[in-house]
């Protein structure tokens, strides 16, 4: 058995054991781990459930993130899956297909507890009042494990893609091209370890 499939099977067994040992009727799996390395959505791998399963059989680590294994295991065991990080796991058609097949919901796309939460609060105020925007600078200073993980460029890229898309989804440049088409948007996360 390939490593990814072995990982999925172990996760499925862990879910079954947890459910039995704790006498649970239902389980909801919530991903609240650190941000993973950015995995762009690839149609040939993520476009269908069959393609995703083939990539897992081939142990395609470039396209199969750990959270995808967790989501796959959860849905396969009849558990809803909630994504608490900006990973692409719940953005792929293959996962939607599995959710539909198992009749289990998938939800979430980052808990947005820091700069994105603030941005999500202020951007609608700017948009509603038709205030122009020339730039937006976002920063987080993190001294915890998240900061350490996000100090790695590949992990930061996942967070950056999520954070950059927030303004565009709220301000909708197509609706107000004179106000929101040509603004500068910079996202930074700084790791500052505690002494």
Q: For each of these PLM feature ranges, what is it?
A:
Residues 1-105, 110, 117-121:
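Metallocofactor- and cofactor-centric catalytic cores in central/energy metabolism, strongly enriched
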Residues 97, 102-104, 111, 115-195:
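Active-site-lining helix/loop region of Rossmann-like oxidoreductase modules
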